[in-house]
Amino acid sequence: MGAVATAAASYNRILGANDRLRIGAIGTGQRCQYLLSLLNKIGSNDIVAVCDVYEPHRLEAKAKFAPDANDYVHSEDLLERKDIDAVVIGAPDHWHVPLILAAVRAGKDVYCEKPVTHRIEEGPPLIAAVQESKRIVQTGTQQRSWEHYRNAKALIDGGVLGKITFVRTYWYQNHFANQQSGPPIDTSKLDWRRFLGTAPYRPFNHDQYAHWRWYWDFGGGAMTDLFVHWVDVAQWFTGNDMPTRATACGSKFLLPERQTPDTMSAALLYPSVLVEFDSTLLGYIEGGGLMFRGTKAAMRLHRRGFAVYDELPAYSESYEPDVAVLEAKSTHDGTIDHMRNFLECVQSRNTPNAPVEVGVAAARAGHVANFALRGNGVWMPPQQKA
């Protein structure tokens, strides 16, 4: 691994405190384009290169956010540029680890969308490679930088909730209608084989390209998409990062032609807390969030804010007090704070709020839930199995 560190060092551009960072973007679909818009709002950087296997995506990103940027089909061509300090990765999940490894070996710092891994076994070697390279890697669990989440954690650390034994997480999206179709894809402008990467070859399939997250070769469904956000918060707040047991079930009630379930539930047991997750593509009532239950109080937490409710002194049929004893509202999307934290750490070389170790632990929980889901409904660590 020493060669990796040496190679990375030879690529580094020496940055001064006031230098504008030079950024490249890989996988410039909808999410990455949003991240590019935030980079422009922050303004301490220049987007100098964009890369995507689909020409309309990269040209759209260039036109909207970086008219003077060079555009590339192959990430290798972008990464070999010695004038690029950092890359933002928004490619499908199965490309995350290969791209992170290539980037840090080329001396680039990395902001990568979650889940940081596509397979659970990718985690340890990824951590080792990033640590050896000395590069900054921020993973896209933006709650780690979102002010009201950080304030909520401070309350929990201060004992406001007492001993927490149960966390319910949920994410309901009214996305069923959006999943039925998508814009046409001009296959003459798509490098399909490049999109497949390490996945087995198959002829072009519109749904697998447009909705790749719902196919096992490219993503992990809601467990490694939505659940990863919330389980990361649960692990962060409770100090747990390794489940000891998991159960899960789910089905394809809405989209039977896909591979991953559209309706599911999971429960992960940790040494000091039980974390549950349920999700479906219907009914946006409640949206997504978490409920922490402790011996002194309960906390409802989501992207719009949080509220704390004192525990009742005796049993009551009143399931929720009318008035929260503590409440906070969020004023903006914390992704911009997460990106700003990344850019500041590129300059300072401090550890970011969601380093690779955090990203691997969050993704691991999603993988464990999928093991239970795809197996007999139960997962235990190998050493615990009979």
Where would I find each of the regions flagged by the language model?
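N-terminal Rossmann-like dinucleotide-binding module
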Residues: 2-65, 143-146, 234
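Catalytic nucleophile loop
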Residues: 32, 96, 230
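Conserved SAM-binding strand-loop segment of SAM-dependent methyltransferases
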Residues: 69-74
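N-terminal Rossmann-like NAD(P) cofactor-binding module of classical short-chain dehydrogenase/reductase
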Residues: 86-88
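Beta-strand-loop-alpha-helix segment that lines the small-molecule cofactor/substrate pocket
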Residues: 92, 97-145, 159
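Short glycine/serine/threonine-enriched helix-capping/active-site loop
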Residues: 138-141, 166-170
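Contiguous beta-strand/loop segments that form the cofactor/metal-binding neighborhood of enzyme cores
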Residues: 150-151, 163, 168, 175-213, ...
